[in-house]
């Protein structure tokens, strides 16, 4: 490294740059340890638990509180809107303050969102429910950066991404039992227990976030990043899967109720769907880097395309099959797209924010059309 020239004597109005352009911007929680995929997976698992119960509760809350039928899917759409809005701050706050602060902030917003949703259900306030769903979505948007954190820290981005997503499988399996128990404690207030469980799950996620390893200290290295154009095709391909999955997901609870399924039993169907979302990550964590990312992503899109028309058959069996297909397709497409954007090098924070923001924007469009499949 070239020795810097002696600094001149300070004078009034003199501007001094104290940052070496070859160094990463320091974060407030810098430290020497590397982050482990296991810690990221645990934090993501608690976020998935909150996502599971919120995804099942919000469509039913919309049906219960919406003043007009066309507004029924708005709380679920607000969940996705919050995730999209969080993409940019989640990406850039990581550099400004470090991973622990960023993930802790996201979990804190989720706690507030769950608490507000509890109040909305008790007071029967539709606007409050939408705002609570928005905050829960923001927490979800922050939590999806666990996969980027793992991919960036590993030389095997597909396997690392799948490893983090696999953490959601246990949360999905435990979700229905925990939701039923929470609902029994909150009886006779329908869905209040589920909303409180979402807030509690984010509280646990907050505890994990503050215990994550510090960010590594800044090191001297050339700034080599992938071009912004590298995210275009991965975002479009995965976005198709996100659109289809959320179109089915937002309409499924109401469709199941229309088939005679009880409201409490809907949590079991949604948990099966969420388990399908994260189960493919287990084999992909072992073999994902042996397969081309494009092939993985396209396989996910095909699975979603198979699942969407199944919901139109309007039977419990067909809706269940649709939920499984679109859940598995979403997982496979997301793993493939994440590995795809890392093929050209380390993506910039702007690229990651645009990628996740684009995915959630298409998910919102899918959620708003979900009532057509209900």
Question: Which role does the model predict for each range below?
Answer:
Residues 27-80, 233-237, 246-266:
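Helix-loop boundary and gating motifs at the non-cytosolic
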Residues 45, 126-143, 318-332:
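Hydrophobic core of transmembrane alpha-helices in multi-pass small-molecule transporters
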Residues 58, 140-154, 332-345:
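Intracellular juxtamembrane helix-capping segments at the cytosolic ends
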Residues 86-99, 183, 279-292:
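Helix-to-loop junctions at the C-terminal end of transmembrane segments
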Residues 108-123, 303-314:
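C-terminal ends and interior cores of transmembrane alpha-helices
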Residues 132-166:
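Cytoplasmic helix-loop-helix junction between adjacent transmembrane helices
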Residues 179-181, 199-218:
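C-terminal membrane-cytosol helix-exit motif in multi-pass small-molecule transporters
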Residues 347-374:
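A late C-terminal transmembrane helix in Major Facilitator Superfamily
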